[in-house]
Amino acid sequence: VKESWVRPASLRGLFALPLMVAITLGMASVGAAHVLAQGVPSAAAGPPGTGLAWGNNSDGELGDGTNNGSSTPIAVDLPAGTTITAIAAGTAYGLALTSAGTVLAWGDNSAGQLGDGTTTDSSTPVTVDLPAGTTITAVAAGDRHSLALTSTGTMLAWGENFIGQLGDGTTTRRSTPVAVDLPAGTTVTAVAAGDRHSLALTSADTVLAWGDNSAGQLGDGTTTDRDTPVAVDLPAGTTITTVAAGAYHSLAVTSADTMLAWGYNIFGQLGDGTTTDRDTPVAVDLPAGTTITTVSGGARHTLAVTSADTMLAWGHNNFGQLGDGTTTDKSTPVAVNLPTGTTITTASAGAFHSLAVTSTGTMLAWGYNALGQVGDGTTATRRRTPVAVDLPTGTTITAAAAGNRHSLAIAPSTSTTTLQVTPPNPEPDQPVTFTATVTCTGSTPTGTVTFHDGTATLDTEPLSGNPTAILRVTRLTPGTHSIHARYNGDSNCPSSTSNPTTVTVPKPTIPVTGTSLPTILTAGSLLTLTGAALILAHRRRPAHGA
């Protein structure tokens, strides 16, 4: 708490008097971040925020504490004060990476995929039992197995492992994380989980794969399952920048802006113009001049966002999941029929439905919807073209992940600050205190609030535990002041600025000093003072002619 002199620009140099004011800060949110697309199910990353979920909830995969499904987004019941930066949707469960580098999980836990040491389902998020001192930077969710990338470039895995999808050299199911048996000296930079296989992108821009290989989805030229990572047989000279996994197929984007795919292809999900399975990577038949920025693999279809912010889709289309207005399978990419003027920033492919986030923070969805996973408030069997997800009023989305029959999203945190003015209409001789109380969705705000009078900065005060910031002003001058306050934000809660509040301080009556005269001028004392002045002047007038 500090005290300071404050005067309006129009009255600099005049009387300085105290003031108190109340202001409400407007809502603000952090900007969109790039989504790291993963397989079916999928994962996505964005700035810190809260979780939303919709669709089927029979296993608690919406994380709201119930088993009731919802055809519109509802809040995931995160622990108090928790914000999340990435989400992943498994077949019937969810993962969330927190701002603190820990992992939360909820939903189906039949194979230990929640990583809490049990096989008990949970309809609210539980903490994954990570090794002490571990910080996680990315997560991915498969059918019933989970992957995590650590800050040191190693990998952890847990859940189902009957086909070696955990990569620890065994086929033993794990209910807590174990280390993936990476080749010596390997640093992993990104992870992706398919139905029963796993992918890792390394710092050498190569790709490792392990687990189920029945359709060649490991890309090593065989159909032999692997319980430890093997190298994907990439074309010579290829550098990979992004990986994604479908249920039984795998995807990669190269530094040359081409795209590779391998594995199961009966519905054309590899996009090479055939329906032939591939046990080594083949080129996706992209339209000429197309550059891919984000990819995502569904159960039997694939989505891609282009550098022109449009979308392509190919593969299975029985429920309209390609979004082209038909239910015809496509073995080469076709354009998603987006609303006019829409710009897509991220996409996620579920089992039989698709999600997309727009540049304005809205969401589109299409495909299978019998359980409300499209999120438009209906359970229409299918949507062949994109429709708007019915988000809560004022909500923006920065990341989305599509599961089997449910959907997840991150809504970035917003902050609001209320300022109380006491007294609300200050007199010239009254002190004024600005008390700013800050609230933030998903977390407890920390940091500072800066108080402003027009373009002038009054002072910056720290938030206390309430959390409030207080500034006392003892020299606010008469006149009109335009007061606003700005919460400066922290790593989990964004900044926000109030609308200006006009505060007018009246001019004081003119004080007069002296032993026998009034201290405040009134009409009567003004006459008295005037008469006294005239008498004094008369007495001091020199004699005529002197």
What are these regions (language model features)?
Residues 2-412:
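Eukaryote-biased RCC1-like beta-propeller repeat architecture
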Residues 412-546:
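Solvent-exposed beta-strand/loop surfaces, strongest in extracytoplasmic domains of secreted
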